């Protein structure tokens, strides 16, 4: 029925308003929220402490509907990727990364991505649409309770997922109105109860929305930097033409006034001969000089259309040493899940190709990129 609402679309305020619209008392909203997000209930008949009259109302007017799982892949390193159906021929990926002391879920916010970073295979397919709040939080709901069931864990046992990163398909801050309620649910003690330090939003640098996020839900922030100067970043991250590095760094400083951590994480994809020289690293130090930060260096995950190569390990080590010598905490991301195309930048989705070449500039053409400290430009091959 067209008027059936998905309760996964509601944060605490939305669920309260919905219960009031049904003539119910406010405490019913908290009961519902705990059943949905702490017990994983998907049928109203399971909610035994709700009045029978409320359960009957909900059965005809609402549902609890996460995106349907199309496929479920397990990597040799324990990484798990779900491909989920978000309708209209679109699918997005959700990736779980297990570690000794935590379990991190990488969540998608859009079907496709309009930012079109040059090194990201997700951007190759173009942009279809924003996900709803229910489709975003539904990825966490689906993954948490699927793994709980598999492990035999009950509602009072420790959660499987301890950290969430908005680093899947899409630019979260270009879907702000749906992402913020999903973040609120992740933090809500009547839902997932994660601390702000354990929830990270990754952005390519949508400056106005970074400022809004700082005021509304100041979770940990990661910024996809990937270049040490505007000329290079204009090509690698085209959004830089709208919000260049000086504006982006100023926004990072403002965000730190509200952030749960006292630093910004800068993500930097290591591209052979493009952005990986010692000169680039030194230039980078000048760019971030007044921003408390750490760096996460990401070995590039090659895909055929990119025309790019991964920096070799020695070059990554030299680059990282420049940052470390300057006192900046620097990590090199361990490649995880690349045998199931779940590694960073590989979330292309088994969906129809939405690329509109006329609208996507130079993607697929020879692109000349200035290399700092080199005598010539680096030419990236055709996609």
From Swiss-Prot:
Disulfide-bonded cysteines: 106-344
GO cellular component: cytoplasm
Residues involved in [4Fe-4S] cluster binding: 113, 117, 120
Note describing how the cofactor binds: Binds 1 [4Fe-4S] cluster. The cluster is coordinated with 3 cysteines and an exchangeable S-adenosyl-L-methionine.
Active site: 93 (proton acceptor), 344 (s-methylcysteine intermediate)
Cited InterPro entries: Aldolase_TIM (IPR013785), Methyltransferase_A (IPR040072), RlmN_N (IPR048641), RNA_MTrfase_RlmN (IPR027492), rRNA_lsu_MTrfase_RlmN/Cfr (IPR004383), rSAM (IPR007197)
Catalytically driven reaction(s): adenosine(2503) in 23S rRNA + 2 reduced [2Fe-2S]-[ferredoxin] + 2 S-adenosyl-L-methionine = 2-methyladenosine(2503) in 23S rRNA + 5'-deoxyadenosine + L-methionine + 2 oxidized [2Fe-2S]-[ferredoxin] + S-adenosyl-L-homocysteine; adenosine(37) in tRNA + 2 reduced [2Fe-2S]-[ferredoxin] + 2 S-adenosyl-L-methionine = 2-methyladenosine(37) in tRNA + 5'-deoxyadenosine + L-methionine + 2 oxidized [2Fe-2S]-[ferredoxin] + S-adenosyl-L-homocysteine
Radical SAM core domain span: 99-339
GO biological process: rRNA base methylation; tRNA methylation
EC number: 2.1.1.192
Pfam family, one: RlmN_N
Subcellular localization(s) per the UniProt record: Cytoplasm
Binding sites annotated in the UniProt record for S-adenosyl-L-methionine: 170-171, 202, 224-226, 301
Family per record: Belongs to the radical SAM superfamily. RlmN family.
NCBIfam families: rRNA_mod_RlmN
Name of the featured protein: Dual-specificity RNA methyltransferase RlmN
Organism: Ralstonia pickettii (strain 12J)
Name of the gene encoding the protein in the UniProt record: rlmN
């Amino acid at each position: 029925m067209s008027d059936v609402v998905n309760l996964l679309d509601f944060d605490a305020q939305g669920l309260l308003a919905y219960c009031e619209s049904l003539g119910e008392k406010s405490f019913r909203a908290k009961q519902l929220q705990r059943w949905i997000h702490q017990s994983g209930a998907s049928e109203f008949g399971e909610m035994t402490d709700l009045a029978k009259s409320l359960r009957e109302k909900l059965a005809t007017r609402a549902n609890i509907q996460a995106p349907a799982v199309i496929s479920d892949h397990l990597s040799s390193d324990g990484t798990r990727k779900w491909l989920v159906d978000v309708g209209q021929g679109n699918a997005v990926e959700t990736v779980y990364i297990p570690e000794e002391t935590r379990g991190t879920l990488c969540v998608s916010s859009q079907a496709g991505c309009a930012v079109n970073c040059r090194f990201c295979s997700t951007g190759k397919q173009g942009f279809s649409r924003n996900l709803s709040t229910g489709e975003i939080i539904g990825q966490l709901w689906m993954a948490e309770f699927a793994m709980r069931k598999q492990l035999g864990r009950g509602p009072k046992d420790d959660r499987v997922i301890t950290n969430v990163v908005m680093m899947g398909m899409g630019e979260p801050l270009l879907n702000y109105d749906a992402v913020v309620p999903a973040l609120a649910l992740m933090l809500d003690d009547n839902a997932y109860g994660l601390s702000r330090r354990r929830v990270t939003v990754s952005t390519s640098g949508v400056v106005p929305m970074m400022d809004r996020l700082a005021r509304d839900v100041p979770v940990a922030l990661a910024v996809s930097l990937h270049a040490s100067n505007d000329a290079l970043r204009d090509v690698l991250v085209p959004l830089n033409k709208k919000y260049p590095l000086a504006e982006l760094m100023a926004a990072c400083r403002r965000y730190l006034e509200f952030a749960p951590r006292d630093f910004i994480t800068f993500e930097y994809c290591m591209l052979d001969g493009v952005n990986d020289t010692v000169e680039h690293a030194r230039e980078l130090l000048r760019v971030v000089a007044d921003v408390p930060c750490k760096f996460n260096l990401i070995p590039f995950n090659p895909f055929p259309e990119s025309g790019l190569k991964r920096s070799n390990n020695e070059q990554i080590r030299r680059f990282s040493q420049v940052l470390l010598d300057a006192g900046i905490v620097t990590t090199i991301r361990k490649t995880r899940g690349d045998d199931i195309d779940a590694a960073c930048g590989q979330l292309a989705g088994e969906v129809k190709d939405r690329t509109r070449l006329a609208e996507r500039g130079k993607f697929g053409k020879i692109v000349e990129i200035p290399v700092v400290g080199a005598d010539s430009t680096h030419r990236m091959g055709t996609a």
